């Protein structure tokens, strides 16, 4: 036949299709192979069993004549109606446009397109005839894959069988002399033939469990040998089945070594999850990596694909154990906990992209909940056909090219009824205040919450996020920077809320044993007070107040309706240079979650909360301020008096109700601000005037003053003895803290210089290290919740009545009902300091003493003496009598020095001062102190350069030259 006459169409449905063009021998669509190329052994390998069953029926003995005719004329493969199967059906002779370039509009109609296509295929057929190529390359695949007994050339090759082999079917044996036409599959790996693993969904491969497959030892070893990149390796079908098999074994067979009963850990967790009606199964990464270390590493480095398999397995396991649970939840989510590697937000780099990370911080902003497309269907606006479903994820965007029915290119509208959505929310996670390096701004990272993780955290809460660090395209960044920049986000897989907010500071068993041992010391309260800022001399009242504030009282919630705060607020008011700011800095370094700010540097919204418009969603969002960030911690405000009145009023609610109500831009909500407030302020004019009341010395209103539990007044009084001790303390501190390399021969030992507090501890071994003090406070707040007895309330009521009576006569700070609660909070804090479960009489007396010291210090100088005399029985409780006797002795020394100055003139010729012991005894008896021998042998007496002369009955004190 001439080439010009060879116009037979390639499709059997075309007119003029001739059966004579069907080849006698065909194999696969990739080329023609003579059946003789297959060896007998190869044929026996593949279909030997089938031939054994069929051969006796091929040529039956009774029909020998018919068989002879068929042997002579050949078998008629086509009956009279075979052409009906290939009749022309134009409505089905259409092809999808997926993957085609649709940028060029084709103006031809369907008939013209099909005519041109037939002409092109006829030309290809003519070329095949000229070149001697296989004339059967365009035959339908259904004709190639027929397993007939008469014509072995239509048998499906083994490599095509491998793709569709059921997982439970054993591997077909293969002889050593297989031909080229039957390439076997390598152990444990499927060959990519007609369909790849990504083209055929795993759930459709078999009616049984799609992840059930048999892997021998060699197969498992091959699975662990990663070929190519890890992300491509874990997407292979055989690797996914291997991961699924191992994870299913882990879920059903893992036994926690700590479980004495030996029950299956995750079967129990699945039952608890179902009982709680949840859809998230938490997998401990440390347990998983102990059983399957390689797969656990794959999970950390390529989490997207591995978690997808794990969630499918978890869903099957849960639904197998609980048949009806699929009616409640359609999907089970796998949450990875205890990821061992913890990264700071500022240390995340591009190497972490598309890996699983664990970060922590404070939630500063939270968006609303949005519906995100998960499984979308479209309606063709021209023919009404429903297209889809299309699966949408965070990495790809679904675009429909054309309608397969009418070939229209749109427009397409989302079918709202059949489209499936999922919840979507965005958080802004900022570094915790305590870990930000000095002089640096805190970094932040966007966190995406999906499905049941919605609303798991609110602004101000400290959380840990385990998720996938990924990137997304942000057009605004490209416009801003002028070159392609991708925004990075963390897709949360697991969110752990730090309920106690102290979990960042881990306590070992040795630490707990040492803390319990310290708590048995009857002087532990005094030791803790001494350990507060030991580099600052004196100020025992401030140190006591700060210690009580750091331990805190017990929060109360009356029947879930009325909440009483347990945090203690402290105000430090005093002259400049009295170490107020240094106290705040010490608390910032010692407290677990302390936020430091200044009155001038913080506005009202900077302290409470601000409302911002989200640049992406264009909706208003809340961003917490300093008080919100310090939730369950301490907020330190320096220069409190420099704040504007409007800014100061904004923290009234935060200090008492410990919440911040917001009604801005249509947002009406409340944020948590459960923190202690320790503020420092300077008096009016720079110096505190004792002839004026407290309110006259500071620009603060009564509502804000009454919210402070303790008011500490610090006055810079000229006292030769106190000044001398202070100067000596400062000089010794500097001498012991010389920089490295200076005066090497005079330097102190290394163990002293490495720790700034070592010098102070050398002078006083009772001082605890800052690290141990942190651990002690953490342990106390986690494990001790003291309760108060009814008997103690009577004494508190009596003291309150007396204070109310005295405050009505004076002009100091008025006593209100809040001060009763202050006494209770401080007594609970003192009990917690001693790790006691109940408040004792000792704790109540200490709280009353601190409150009285605070109240009396705010009065005028003339009123203070009368109040000290009236409340002496409360104020002398648990006071260090050595300190009191030292104060009395110094007063006597000053009186003698003043007398000598009047009588003899200038005192430069005096070398020492002598005080009679009898005078000191008389002074001590006024305070009900009768035994002076412990004082004479104490360090207070000796360190202040006092010498006792028992023979003469005098106390000698040398004067500085």
UniProtKB/Swiss-Prot annotation:
Bias kind Polar residues: ranges: 1-17
What catalytic activity does the UniProt entry give for this protein?
ATP + H2O = ADP + phosphate + H(+)
**Disulfide bridge positions per record:** none
Q: Which Gene3D superfamilies match?
A: 2.20.28.10, mini-chromosome maintenance (MCM) complex, chain A, domain 1, Nucleic acid-binding proteins, P-loop containing nucleotide triphosphate hydrolases
Which residues are listed for ATP binding in this entry?
Answer: 574-581
Spell out the GO cellular component terms annotated for this protein, sorted alphabetically and separated by semicolons: chromatin; MCM complex; THO complex
Report the residue ranges that make up the MCM domain in this protein.
524-730
Its principal location? nucleus
Q: Which GO terms describe its molecular function?
A: 3'-5' DNA helicase activity; ATP binding; ATP hydrolysis activity; single-stranded DNA binding; single-stranded DNA helicase activity; zinc ion binding
The answer to keyword Acyltransferase applying to this record is no
Q: Where is the composition biased (Basic and acidic residues)?
A: 120-146, 166-176
Give me any GO biological process, just one.
regulation of root meristem growth
Region of interest (Disordered), ranges: 1-81, 120-220
- The EC number on file is 3.6.4.12
Q: Where is this motif: Arginine finger?
A: 706-709
Instruction: Tell me the keywords, alphabetical order.
Output: ATP-binding, Cell cycle, DNA replication, DNA-binding, Helicase, Hydrolase, Metal-binding, Nucleotide-binding, Nucleus, Zinc, Zinc-finger
Here the segments flagged for biased composition (Acidic residues) are 39-78, 205-220
UniProt feature coiled coil, ranges: none
Q: Which CDD domains match?
A: MCM2
Compartments, as annotated in UniProt = Nucleus
Family assignment from sequence similarity: Belongs to the MCM family.
Q: What is this protein called?
A: DNA replication licensing factor MCM2
Q: State the species of origin.
A: Oryza sativa subsp. indica
């Amino acid at each position: 036949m001439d080439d010009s006459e060879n116009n037979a169409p390639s499709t059997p449905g075309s007119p003029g299709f001739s059966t004579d063009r069907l080849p006698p021998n065909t194999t696969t669509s990739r080329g023609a192979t003579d059946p003789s190329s297959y060896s007998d052994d190869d044929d026996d390998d593949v279909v030997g069993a089938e031939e054994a069953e069929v051969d006796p029926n091929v040529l039956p003995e009774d029909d020998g004549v018919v068989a002879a005719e068929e042997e002579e004329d050949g078998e008629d493969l086509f009956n009279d109606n075979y052409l009906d199967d290939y009749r022309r059906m134009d409505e089905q002779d259409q092809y999808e446009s997926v993957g085609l370039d649709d940028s060029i509009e084709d103006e031809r109609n369907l008939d013209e397109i099909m005519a041109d296509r037939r002409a092109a295929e006829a030309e290809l057929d003519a070329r095949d005839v000229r070149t001697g190529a296989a004339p059967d390359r365009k035959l339908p695949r259904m004709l190639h894959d027929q397993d007939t007994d008469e014509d072995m050339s239509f048998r499906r090759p083994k490599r095509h069988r491998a793709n569709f082999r059921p997982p439970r079917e054993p591997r077909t044996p293969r002889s050593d002399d297989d031909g080229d036409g039957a390439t076997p599959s390598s152990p444990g790996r499927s060959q990519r033939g007609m369909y790849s693993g990504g083209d055929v969904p795993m759930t459709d491969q078999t009616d049984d469990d799609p992840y059930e497959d048999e892997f021998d030892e060699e197969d498992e070893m091959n699975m662990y040998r990663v070929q190519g990149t890890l992300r491509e390796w874990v997407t292979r079908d055989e690797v996914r089945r291997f991961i699924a098999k191992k994870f299913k074994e882990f879920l059903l067979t893992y036994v926690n070594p700590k479980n004495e009963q030996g029950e299956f850990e995750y079967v129990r967790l699945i039952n608890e999850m179902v009982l709680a009606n949840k859809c998230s199964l938490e997998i401990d990464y440390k347990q998983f990596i102990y059983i399957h270390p390689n797969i656990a590493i794959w999970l950390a480095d390529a989490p997207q694909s591995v978690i997808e398999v794990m969630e499918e397995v978890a869903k099957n396991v849960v639904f197998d154990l609980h048949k009806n649970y699929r009616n409640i939840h359609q999907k089970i989510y796998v949450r990875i906990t205890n990821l061992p590697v913890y990264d700071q937000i500022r240390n995340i780099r591009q190497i972490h992209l598309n890996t699983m990370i664990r970060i922590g911080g404070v939630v500063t902003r939270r968006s609303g909940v949005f519906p995100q497309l998960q499984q979308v269907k479209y309606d063709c606006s021209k023919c009404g056909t429903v297209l889809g479903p299309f699966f949408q994820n965070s990495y790809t965007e679904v675009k429909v090219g054309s309608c397969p029915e009418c070939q229209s290119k749109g427009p397409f509208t989302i079918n709202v009824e059949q489209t499936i959505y999922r919840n979507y929310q965005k958080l802004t996670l900022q570094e915790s205040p305590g870990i930000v390096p000095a002089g640096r701004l805190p970094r932040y990272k966007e966190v995406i919450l999906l499905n049941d993780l919605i609303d798991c955290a609110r602004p101000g809460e400290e959380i840990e996020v385990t998720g996938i660090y990924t990137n997304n395209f942000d057009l605004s960044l490209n416009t801003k920077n002028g070159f392609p920049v991708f925004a990075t986000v963390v897709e949360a897989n697991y969110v752990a809320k730090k309920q106690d907010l102290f979990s960042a500071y881990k306590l070992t068993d040795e630490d707990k044993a040492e803390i319990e041992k310290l708590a048995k010391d009857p002087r532990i309260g005094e030791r803790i007070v001494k350990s507060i800022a030991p580099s600052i001399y004196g100020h025992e009242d401030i140190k006591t107040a700060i210690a009580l504030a750091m331990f805190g009282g017990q929060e109360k919630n009356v029947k879930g309706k009325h909440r009483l705060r347990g945090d203690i607020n402290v105000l430090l008011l005093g002259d400049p240079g009295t170490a107020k700011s240094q106290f705040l800095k010490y608390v910032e370094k010692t407290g677990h979650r302390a936020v430091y700010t200044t009155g001038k540097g913080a506005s009202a919204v900077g302290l409470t909360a601000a409302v911002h418009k989200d640049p992406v969603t264009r909706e208003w969002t809340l961003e917490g301020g300093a008080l919100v960030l310090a939730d369950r911690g301490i907020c330190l405000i320096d220069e409190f008096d420099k704040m504007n009145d409007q800014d100061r009023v904004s923290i009234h609610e935060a200090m008492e109700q410990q919440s911040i109500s917001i009604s801005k831009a249509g947002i009406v909500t409340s944020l948590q601000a459960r923190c202690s407030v320790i503020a420092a302020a300077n008096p009016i004019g720079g110096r505190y005037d004792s002839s004026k009341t407290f309110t006259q010395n500071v620009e603060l209103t009564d509502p804000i003053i009454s919210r402070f539990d303790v008011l500490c007044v610090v006055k810079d009084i000229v006292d030769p003895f106190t000044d001398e001790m202070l100067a000596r303390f400062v000089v010794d501190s500097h001498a012991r803290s010389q920089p490295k390399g200076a005066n090497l021969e005079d330097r102190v030992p290394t163990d002293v210089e490495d720790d700034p507090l070592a010098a102070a501890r050398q002078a006083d071994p009772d001082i605890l290290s800052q690290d141990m003090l942190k651990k002690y406070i953490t342990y106390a707040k986690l494990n001790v919740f003291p309760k108060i007895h009814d008997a103690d309330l009577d004494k508190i009521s009596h003291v309150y009545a007396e204070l109310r009576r005295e405050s009505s006569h004076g002009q100091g700070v008025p006593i209100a009902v809040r001060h009763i609660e202050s006494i209770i909070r401080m007594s609970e804090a003192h009990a917690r300091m001693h790790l006691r479960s109940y408040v004792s009489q000792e704790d109540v007396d200490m709280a009353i003493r601190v409150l009285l010291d605070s109240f009396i210090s705010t009065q005028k100088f003339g009123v203070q003496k009368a109040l000290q005399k009236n409340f002496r029985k409360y104020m002398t409780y648990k006071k260090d009598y050595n300190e009191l006797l030292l104060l009395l002795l110094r007063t006597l020394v000053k009186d003698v020095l003043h007398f000598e100055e009047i009588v003899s003139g200038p005192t430069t010729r005096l070398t020492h001062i002598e005080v009679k012991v009898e005078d000191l005894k008389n002074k001590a008896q006024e305070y009900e102190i009768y035994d002076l021998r412990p004082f004479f042998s104490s360090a207070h007496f000796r360190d202040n350069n006092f010498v006792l002369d028992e023979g003469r009955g005098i106390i000698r004190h040398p004067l500085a030259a």
